[in-house]
Amino acid sequence: MKLKESQQQSNRLSNEDLVPLGQEKRTWKAMNFASIWMGCIHNIPTYATVGGLIAIGLSPWQVLAIIITASLILFGALALNGHAGTKYGLPFPVIIRASYGIYGANIPALLRAFTAIMWLGIQTFAGSTALNILLLNMWPGWGEIGGEWNILGIHLSGLLSFVFFWAIHLLVLHHGMESIKRFEVWAGPLVYLVFGGMVWWAVDIAGGLGPIYSQPGKFHTFSETFWPFAAGVTGIIGIWATLILNIPDFTRFAETQKEQIKGQFYGLPGTFALFAFASITVTSGSQVAFGEPIWDVVDILARFDNPYVIVLSVITLCIATISVNVAANIVSPAYDIANALPKYINFKRGSFITALLALFTVPWKLMESATSVYAFLGLIGGMLGPVAGVMMADYFIIRKRELSVDDLYSETGRYVYWKGYNYRAFAATMLGALISLIGMYVPVLKSLYDISWFVGVLISFLFYIVLMRVHPPASLAIETVEHAQVRQAE
């Protein structure tokens, strides 16, 4: 699908990274998408989130049910939101122009970019803690660097590990999207080695799977379990709230819809359930071994005394962290930043700007406890859920999966609305965010905050449809006629 020459030459709304991909560049098969998920899921913060569910009192079986439920919902959301990317070869920042306007799209795109950059900082810090353990084992004096000097609450050795691990990401970014595809193919499966070994250790030290999975939770009745269960599902989805939005950045490379849907199904529910089994087993095993559930896998590694195990485990965890960072937390904001200033910034420049901003996120504060992690995830869900709701309502209900590609790059086309902004999309987004996040400040409505992603998606989805029906833009009438003519021709 090609643009008109006028759109191709416009620097205000396009550059070579934002225009539709030609069919010759759409080469990703199901295995490529499955590999992305294998790499993304197996990482330290995901383990911490799953382990945190055990730590707050849910039983192993309850946690496993939470993971399976969340992964199936994620699969559905990703397959739906990725449809337009595959059909038109477009990235997220361009697709969202249809609902928010050609200029208004920059606001949710940059919001999503900010969230991804925060996640990039968190993931990079998590990987750097593993690297720090490796350096402490190789060089015992590493922890004494700087004496008692702390910078913003982190020891100098930890800060140096953070910066060094951050710099490794730049090597992968230097080679662009094709290197990301190749990296993901082997990075994900490699992580199974470490978590498989840790499961073996946990089962051995606990005396089998029976003692691990027979541990009771503190929630017994349905009424006691429902809200922790729902909050857990929301927390898991919150981890991937950014990727739900920017999945078109990847599905635009798919050969067909079938390939992206199959790949995400193979790579998400099954892989996530397997990872959940490993996380639950290791966390519960740590409770048997150390008298308390340890929700951070790096803390468990720090208690091992075999240097070979530590070296192999740390290297693999670092690879896994780079894998998820590049796929989930760098690609998306890179496109978003390029979309905001396409005349000056392409995908590669956006990638390096993203990496640079992640240095200033102070992520060690967010990783202090399971409580702080879940507070952050709830906030993410409340902010990004409404954007996903608007996107799906616009594409599937209002547009009926039909977009005018040329108009997405036009300053005089149907997606200009009012000076480039569609107030209906912003009103629906703000209402969804307000209702989903109000529980942070109003205790009686805390239950809404516990399921913030679902509330945000549902409210914005419905309200956007209402606004587009009650006060439709003039361009929508033209689209309705065009759709009717197409159906008659068929």
From Swiss-Prot:
GO biological process: nucleobase transport
Entry GO CC: plasma membrane
Alphabetized GO MF terms: nucleobase transmembrane transporter activity; symporter activity
Membrane topology: Multi-pass membrane protein
Transmembrane segment boundaries: 36-56, 60-80, 116-136, 151-171, 190-210, 225-245, 265-285, 308-328, 350-370, 373-393, 425-445, 448-468
Triggers of expression: Expression is very low in excess nitrogen (glutamate plus ammonia) and is induced during limiting-nitrogen conditions (glutamate). Expression is further induced when allantoin or allantoate are added during limiting-nitrogen conditions.
Pfam families: Transp_cyt_pur
Coiled coil: none
Reaction catalysed by this enzyme: (S)-allantoin(in) + H(+)(in) = (S)-allantoin(out) + H(+)(out)
Matching InterPro entries: NCS1 (IPR012681), Pur-cyt_permease (IPR001248), Uracil/uridine/allantoin_perm (IPR045225)
Lineage top rank: taxon: Bacteria
Gene3D superfamilies found in the cross-reference section: Hydantoin permease
Its job: Uptake of allantoin into the cell. Allantoin uptake is not dependent on sodium, and PucI is likely to be a proton-coupled symporter. Shows highest recognition for binding of allantoin, good recognition for binding of hydantoin, L-5-benzylhydantoin and 5-hydroxyhydantoin, and to a lesser extent for a range of nucleobases and nucleosides.
Family of the protein in this entry: Belongs to the purine-cytosine permease (2.A.39) family.
Entry protein name: Allantoin permease
Organism of origin: Bacillus subtilis (strain 168)
Organism classification: Bacteria, Bacillati, Bacillota, Bacilli, Bacillales
